[in-house]
Structures are given as C-alpha cells and as structure tokens.
Amino acid sequence: MSIQITIDGKTLTTEEGRTLVDVAAENGVYIPTLCYLKDKPCLGTCRVCSVKVNGNVAAACTVRVSKGLNVEVNDPELVDMRKALVEFLFAEGNHNCPSCEKSGRCQLQAVGYEVDMMVSRFPYRFPVRVVDHASEKIWLERDRCIFCQRCVEFIRDKASGRKIFSISHRGPESRIEIDAELANAMPPEQVKEAVAICPVGTILEKRVGYDDPIGRRKYEIQSVRARALEGEDK
C-alpha cells in the first residue's frame, strides 16, 4: 500500500513496510550503516544509522515505514551522534588504516570520511587480541572487529547450515571466533564472500594481499555514499 512519510521536512511517497534506510537512499538521503546489508535480515548492531522517528532516536535499519512517519536525519545533534558512534568504533579497536590490507575497501574507513571524522574524541584503547590463523584459508585479525555480526549470521556452512563464525565472551573480553574445520571446507567463492561482507579488515584471505592498487580500490572508485544511494552498497 502506498503511504506518505516525511524525511527532513520533505514529503515522500513509498510502500508501507519497507526499510527506512532503503527508502531514504532511493530519495537521495544518505544514512550511514555498517551492519546493514540490503535484502538481508536486519541486525541493528552498530547503531551508526541512528535517526529520529517521530521524535525518538531509532536505528533506521530496524524501522519499517508506516503512514505519517516523521523522520529527522540531518539534524545537527543526530549528525554528531552518528559521528561519535563511528569514533567509538575507531577508539575501541586497532584500526591502523595505512598498513591495513582492507584500506580503500574498508566500509568503516569510508564511513569515517563521510561523517568528517579526523581523529576520535575518545581515548584509544589499543586492545590486545590474539590473531587466529588456525584456518587454512582465513586469517582472523580480531583487534579490528566491530562486532557487526554480519559474518556470524550470513556466512554458514553450505552442507549443514552451521555458523562458521561466532562471538565468544562478553563485554571488553568479547572476541570473534572461527570454526577452523568448517572454514577449511569453505569453497573459494565463499571465502571471498566472507572477506567482502566484513566491513573492516578482520576477515582476510590467506595468500592474497594488497591486490588492489591504490587509486583502484573499492571506495576510491566510488564513495560509500554514492554506492548506498544507488542501492549497491549499504
């Protein structure tokens, strides 16, 4: 059913029940995301897509549009909130962009540029997390993980449907885990899918590195904003 909603004072016509992030993008309004993937079940873990819906802060990827919805995206308070959330993620992990293999292809890095982050306002933690290289095909850089849970939910063993990745422990001790036995059975295309689905440089394919020349990397060719507005990258 066609309905009308308002985004930043502009009245739009869309279909009831669609995801707010997608509706906004189709109407030229960019809302940054890190855990959301178009046409996949919503995770709502990163909160980087926070907006106001009828006066209340909500994660846009979790909101299904309905008649009369009033959405604020570019309010200064919200813009700073989203920037702060990105800064938190940079401060919590070890994101050394110049030396990271994912630089230029990293969604966190690209979103950082979009929210005008230069340096985090929060003290950096520099956590020490053990690298997991038990798998024959995947190198797991735990200290870069932002716990978006994309890999946990969407990368599964082809035969059994079991999860290949998981998160163990709680709070500051949380860390990403990999089932080496299941990972060793992953076909090459699924390994590449796992690397691509990770928004940072946590999941890396062994024996493949720095194969995209500077100037030809994903977000150098087209920004994360442009990709999102075209529905190609969330």
Swiss-Prot record:
Tetramer of an alpha and a gamma subunits (flavin-containing dimer), and a delta and a nickel-containing beta subunits (hydrogenase dimer). SMART domains: NADH-G_4Fe-4S_3 (SM00929). Residues 2-77 form the 2Fe-2S ferredoxin-type domain. GO terms for cellular component: cytoplasm; membrane. GO terms for biological process: ATP synthesis coupled electron transport. Its EC number is 1.12.1.2. It comes from the Bacteria. Residues 77-116 form the 4Fe-4S His(Cys)3-ligated-type domain. [2Fe-2S] cluster binds at residues 35, 46, 49, 61. This is NAD-reducing hydrogenase HoxS subunit gamma.
